C-alpha cells in the first residue's frame, strides 16, 4: 500500500543521487525543478517505470516536499512549473487482440495459469468472481440444441441467468475437471490472491487496462458478445 510506495520512492532516490549527481545526499534547499525533472527521467529511463507508475511516484515525492514546506524547512516549491499527468486507461475492457495475447501468454506457474484461465472464463461468460467461485457442476446442462449452458442465479442480483458456453470456456471447464471439491467446477483462489496475480499477468502482457473481474465482465459485454453475434440484452 501507501507505506510500500513511500519506501520504494526513497529507495529510488537513494539510487538516483549517486547515478545522476554522483553524491549520496542532497540538502533540501538544493531541490529545484531540474532535480524533479531529472528524477522523473531516471524513473523512466533507468527504472523502466511506466507513465502511471512514474506519476504515482512523483505524487509521493510531491507530498514529501509539501511536508518539508509546511514544517518551514523549504521556503519555496521545487514542483512549481512541473507538469505530469496519468495516462487515461479508463477504456475498462480488453480488445480481441488483447484477449488473444492473454490466452497465448506463457504463465510462470500453475497458479498463475489457473488465475488467467478463470479470468478468461469470466471474459467469455460475463460471470463475476463470486459466481465463478460458487459455480457447481449441477449448474452445467446440455439442452436440446446440443449446446452446454450454465443455469445459475447471480449472487449479486439473485436473478436467474442462462449462459451458452462457447468453445473457450468449455475447454477451460474440461481442463480443471475433477480438481475442485464439493461439486465445484473450479478450484478458485481467494479474491485477494487473484487480484494480485492478475496485476502481475497484466504487467507481463503489457496491458494498460488493469485486469479485474469488472473488466472481464465489461469485456464480455463489449468485445465477446458483439464478435459472436450475441445480442446484448
Residue locations for each model-derived region?
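C-terminal catalytic core of Y-nucleophile DNA break-rejoin enzymes
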Residues: 155-174, 180-200
